[in-house]
Swiss-Prot record:
Location in the cell: Cytoplasm
Family label: Belongs to the NDK family.
Cellular component GO terms held in the UniProt record: cytoplasm
SUBUNIT field: Homotetramer.
HAMAP family in the cross-refs: NDP_kinase
The name this protein goes by in its record: Nucleoside diphosphate kinase
Lineage of producing organism: Bacteria, Pseudomonadati, Pseudomonadota, Betaproteobacteria, Burkholderiales
A molecular function GO annotation: ATP binding
């Protein structure tokens, strides 16, 4: 299996619930290493830039408004099969459809306030990581 990196964001709803540590424990318990992390209050421009691929979608404005509604925790995870592993930990986008024991089933309230974001593919992960972390701030360990 390949060692991969993926971008993970703990969204404003989960940060407000004070569950960052519980989510980090799940990452580490699954063998994912946190190799870069920072808390941020995203600006509208940052959120719009990050989610630009969705700019034509009807939910875009609500998504951006939500992502700037409070601080987020942004991290890079590294490990074997990190992208798929992280997506399995997150669960389905809609927490009502997420498997019991996943981050979204346990901590998310709705399809909009769904606790976490994760890269969906290796190419996306590279772009998303570069968006928030210049290479000099990411450390394999």
């Amino acid at each position: 299996m390949a060692i991969e990196r993926t971008l993970s964001i703990i969204k404003p709803d989960a940060v407000a619930k004070n569950v960052i540590g519980q989510i980090y424990s799940r990452f580490e318990g699954a063998g994912l290493k946190i190799i870069a992390a920072r808390m941020a209050q995203l600006s509208r421009a940052e959120a719009e830039g990050f989610y630009a691929v969705h700019s034509a979608r009807p939910f875009f404005k609500d998504l951006v408004d939500f992502m700037i509604s409070g601080p987020v925790m942004i991290q890079v995870l590294e490990g074997e099969n990190a992208i798929a592993k992280h997506r399995d930990l997150m669960g389905a986008t809609d927490p009502k459809k997420a498997e019991k024991g996943t981050i979204r089933a346990d901590f998310a309230d709705s399809i909009d306030a769904n606790a976490v974001h994760g890269s969906d593919a290796e190419e996306t992960a590279k772009v998303e990581i570069a968006y928030y972390f210049p290479a000099l701030n990411v450390y394999s360990r």
